[in-house]
Amino acid sequence: MMERAEDLRLSLSLSSPLIAPRTHHVAMLFHAPPEKRFLEMPLLPAAKRSEVVAAEEERAGLRGGGGSDEEDGGCGIDGSRKKLRLSKDQSAVLEDSFREHPTLNPRQKATLAQQLGLRPRQVEVWFQNRRARTKLKQTEVDCEFLKRCCETLTEENRRLQKEVQELRALKLVSPHLYMNMSPPTTLTMCPSCERVSNTNNNSSAAAAADRRGIRTTTAAAGGSVVDTAADGGILCHRPIAVRPQQS
């Protein structure tokens, strides 16, 4: 009986290290900062993820009281991440430095840490978390932009398909309508070309009149045009306006 109890205690002690890492990981994920929690959590749709990010950032801002809580880069005695509470001025200086240089070299890191009274490792961890948040927000913005583009293209494709169906229906109803139609054109002529066109039209009209046996003569004094037939008979008199000659 004693041997069986010892075996039972031994089996429990051997199995506990296999279960402990899973519970420890869950606890670490629960106590992790918002940006690390979002990177390790399963991906959600863009709308849900943006709502979660906004809610977590608002909650973090209320908890920080104007400052911010960041990872210290080290671990405590129980293995949990230590939090670094930054003041409002420290957060502002770090944000300004991040806008100028998203990635710092060791010299810049040491200078900034000395200026803020922090360790270089703390500054490095803050920049890593800030880059992760920026990348996540940019991914959400790109996702929303591509989603709107996809919706616009889908609507445009639907409209074009509807137009194609309408054109096919019209073509089936009246197939000869499109064959006889000529595309509309707009002609613009300069005055010189118009004079040349009028001269050509007059020549064509005169040639047609000769073919019909009609001759056109212009009376200089009377200022009229007389159309005569081939046998010499007068068909009609057409008065014309005589322009005075310029000296």
Curated annotation (Swiss-Prot):
The keyword Transcription regulation applies. Residues 79-138 bind DNA. It comes from Oryza sativa subsp. indica. GO terms for cellular component: nucleus. It is found in: Nucleus. Residues 137-182 are annotated as: Leucine-zipper. This is Homeobox-leucine zipper protein HOX17. Belongs to the HD-ZIP homeobox family. Class II subfamily. InterPro entries: HD, HD-ZIP_Homeobox_LZ_Class_II, Homeobox_CS, Homeodomain-like_sf, HTH_motif, Leu_zip_homeo. GO terms for molecular function: DNA-binding transcription factor activity, RNA polymerase II-specific; sequence-specific DNA binding. PANTHER family: HOMEOBOX-LEUCINE ZIPPER PROTEIN HAT14 (PTHR45714), HOMEOBOX-LEUCINE ZIPPER PROTEIN HAT2 (PTHR45714:SF16). Its main location: nucleus.
